Amino acid sequence: MLKTILPTIMLIPLAWFTSNNMVWINTTLYSFTISLTSLHLLYQPLDNSLNLSPEFFLDSLSTPLLILTIWLLPLMLIASQSHLSSGSTFQKKSYITTIILLQVSLIMTFAATDLILLYIMFETTLIPTMVIITRWGNQLERLNAGSYFLFYTLMGSLPLLVTLMLIQNTLGSLNLMMLPYLIKPIDNLWSTNMLWLTCTMAFMVKMPLYGLHLWLPKAHVEAPIAGSMVLAAILLKLGGYGMLRITILLDPLTTHMYYPFLMLSLWGMVMSSSICLRQTDMKSLIAYSSVSHMALVIIAIMLQTPWSFMGALTLMIAHGLTSSMLFCLANSNYERIHNRTMILARGLQTLLPLMATWWLLASLINMAPPPTINLIGELLIITTSFSWSNFTIFPMGLNVLITTMYTLHMMTTTQRGKTSHHAKSIKPSFTRENTLMALHFLPLLLLSLNPKIILGLTY
């Protein structure tokens, strides 16, 4: 693991000591090299001892999320260049440093062997993310968004810390490989139910569960492009990863406790999709669509079957790349018309035909057509939910229908129609932007050819 963590940390001195006109090029190329050299980790043989140490370990659950995190760093740097073009060199280097610190804490979260280390790194990601939102956001409301993000996350996480301390005192270890052998069968008591709730609530806030999601649209809308990308692609997946780890350990309790959360997720999935139909703000629409997709992941994790675990991990990876691509496209529109309102960006297809092609591809992937990994993830989750109850066909079918509707609404509103007068003299699409979209689309394409490497522990 150190061969990934140490080069990433060394990006910080590279950013500060490189010449001013080469700061973006050097950091992007170096981080892209780290991404490419880390891809070999996706090959997980049956013997995991090569990826094991007292502090860090990788298995087929954490590796795909870790690779997604590493892959996203150069993409964030490519996307941020225009946003910081008018800033001073010190601002640019500070921004890059903040992103790298966030990256290191995310890598250590996904690779943590100990639950306390996982908790510490999980909380550490909060600080750089909040700095990115409150320091480099576009509007004044970014301070309000930062406050929401901070307090929702902290209020969900503090009970988890107390519970972890309690488990440490009782069992003597929080090592993820030791815990399955130390935990005794848990009775369905009021106290153990509370223990399950405190363990999962921190991750449900992060997912977010419908009802605890109010911080997400605010944070997405006010964050700069790198903040939106890392929020959508990685930070929401931290919740899913934590829930997968914890619910497997507290196994018998999950089958007693899952019912209200399943109902809330099924309801929230349809509601957040419906909210998307009424949005005028591009980034807000994509943020609410993330809530809808993550509700599917919560349903999959709660059902606790091998198929649902495969579906949850596949959908998390697929959604990470898709939503990040959509945020990049929304940002490219914002950089040209300086407004997030969709109706003001209408008719851009005639002015930016290549960008319209990327919009079409991203919209299609968001609707989960075959042969994309989005479809594989959704199919696995939907079939598992049918095996739990046949009545889930109604909310699931409705969600698929509404997802298609709001995606087409977003596509047609921004690309079709008569071009507005203020959009006549906009800049053309740059090679940098097309490269960025291609680097989002290429992994989705390649993974659809061989999805088994991201199907997780139960494949």
UniProtKB/Swiss-Prot annotation:
InterPro entries: NADH4_N, NADH_Q_OxRdtase_chainM/4, NADH_UbQ_OxRdtase, ND/Mrp_TM. It is an enzyme of class 7 (translocase). Its EC number is 7.1.1.2. It catalyses: a ubiquinone + NADH + 5 H(+)(in) = a ubiquinol + NAD(+) + 4 H(+)(out). GO terms for biological process: electron transport coupled proton transport; mitochondrial electron transport, NADH to ubiquinone; mitochondrial respiratory chain complex I assembly. Keywords: Electron transport, Membrane, Mitochondrion, Mitochondrion inner membrane, NAD, Respiratory chain, Translocase, Transmembrane, Transmembrane helix, Transport, Ubiquinone. It is found in: Mitochondrion inner membrane. It is a multi-pass membrane protein. The chain crosses the membrane at residues 21-43, 60-80, 99-119, 147-167, 195-215, 224-244, 257-277, 284-303, 308-330, 351-371, 375-395, 436-456. GO terms for molecular function: NADH dehydrogenase (ubiquinone) activity; ubiquinone binding. GO terms for cellular component: mitochondrial inner membrane. Belongs to the complex I subunit 4 family. Core subunit of the mitochondrial membrane respiratory chain NADH dehydrogenase (Complex I) which catalyzes electron transfer from NADH through the respiratory chain, using ubiquinone as an electron acceptor. Essential for the catalytic activity and assembly of complex I. Core subunit of respiratory chain NADH dehydrogenase (Complex I) which is composed of 45 different subunits. This is NADH-ubiquinone oxidoreductase chain 4. It comes from Loxodonta africana (African elephant).
